[in-house]
């Protein structure tokens, strides 16, 4: 499903990734763990087509990722630094996601609403706490029904109850649809609890 071979990325002469290889099978929950600055986010930005590699290949389902909108429809990405349109509320972002992702599941959106009872869907997302903004990002992403879910520090800043709830939803999606999940974190203990491979 995900194949990275001999990936090299340089920034102004600094080699952030040096011959990185990674192979993730369909339906796996794969964890990337390491301290800040280890290259986890750089690798993820290649997998999502944000960065173009200096050398090597980055493929999803056998296709190059960079500048490939067909492949990008197949995955949802929750970055560590979430961005929302100014003054957009959850319902407006839902409509935006529906326009971007043909498989967006409206019924699932309303079903998952009960898992996020503290979030007012008509309130500006930017006025919510960072933890609530992460919950909104996850809520919207999972409703796109992605084949691949790419998560960068997804539960950082969430309380224990919400962390468990998020992982429960992810596990149910993997079991139901054989979703492939790639998650990066500095928390090895948490990844060991949820991942097939770390």
Enumerate the predicted regions with their spans.
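ABC transporter nucleotide-binding domains
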Residues: 2, 9-195
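H-loop (His-switch) and adjacent beta-strand-loop-beta switch element
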Residues: 198
């Amino acid at each position: 499903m995900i194949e990275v071979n001999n990936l090299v990325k340089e920034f102004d002469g600094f080699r952030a990734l040096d011959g990185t290889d990674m192979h993730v099978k369909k339906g796996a929950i794969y964890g990337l763990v390491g301290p800040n600055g280890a290259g986890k986010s750089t690798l993820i930005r290649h997998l999502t087509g944000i960065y173009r590699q200096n050398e090597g290949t980055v493929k999803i389902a056998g296709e190059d990722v960079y500048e490939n909108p067909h492949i990008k429809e197949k995955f949802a990405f929750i970055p560590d630094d979430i961005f929302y349109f100014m003054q957009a509320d959850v319902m407006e972002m839902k409509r935006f996601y529906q326009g971007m992702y043909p498989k967006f599941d409206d019924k699932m959106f309303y079903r998952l609403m009960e898992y996020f009872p503290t979030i007012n869907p008509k309130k500006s997302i930017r006025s919510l706490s960072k933890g609530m903004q992460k919950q909104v990002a996850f809520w919207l992403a999972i409703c796109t029904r992605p084949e691949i879910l790419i998560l960068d520090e997804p539960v950082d800043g969430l309380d224990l109850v919400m962390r468990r709830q998020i992982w429960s939803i992810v596990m149910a999606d993997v079991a139901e649809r054989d979703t492939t999940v790639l998650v990066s974190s500095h928390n090895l203990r948490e990844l060991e609890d949820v991942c097939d491979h770390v």
